[in-house]
Amino acid sequence: SSKPEMFGLDPSSAAKKALKIFSDYKIKNIVELGAGLGRDSLYFGKNSINVYSLDYSPSAIASINIKIQSNNLSKIITTKLFDIRKKLPFEDNSVDACFSHMLYCMALTNEDLQSLNNEICRILKPQGINIYTVRSTDDGDYRQGIHRGEDLYENQGFIVHFFSKKKIDNLSLGFENISITSFEEGSFPRKLYFVVNKKI
């Protein structure tokens, strides 16, 4: 985007909801997948959660690193340039929780998503939590623009993968689906689902 700082440093509403869940489960170490410019990683870090932030964009990682330094959070937030379509760089059963805000809506096929979910399941400890948000099929942009196969649509150069509750259920192999909650974000507004899965 032409204004990479448009999200500012305010955390997403999804991160605020996730923090409450992390504290309920006494979770202290998380992996954020697709950390973007780091607004949620910083929020978790400032709330004493150790964060391992992954993103495939070098400029995003550079931006997070500057914010980590200026907020004195280098002991609590670690970044890594990484493409989440590859095997995640963590041991089996080693992570308390994963968080991703709209990562699953990127230009990922159903097969990519299943593979990502399997990897998240692999790295989570037993009873570990995966929280993710996705654009819903109730969203105003669904079925707009150029259809790119499955539930992927391209608008203004961006490809978005939209999710029904059924698609979310189909992605829960190895997990218990704790909750799927609808919420809205932004002025459009975007319509999303907030998904909480617990590793079985």
Pin down the residues of each PLM region.
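A short acidic, Gly/Pro-enriched loop at the edge of an enzyme's catalytic core
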Residues: 85-98
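Class I (Rossmann-like) S-adenosyl-L-methionine-dependent methyltransferase catalytic domain
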Residues: 1-25, 30-77, 81-87, 129-200
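Short glycine-rich, flexible loops that bind phosphorylated cofactors or substrates
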Residues: 106-107, 139
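A short, conserved alpha-helix within the catalytic core of class I
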Residues: 107-119
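A short beta-strand submotif of the Rossmann-like class I SAM-dependent methyltransferase core
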Residues: 100-103
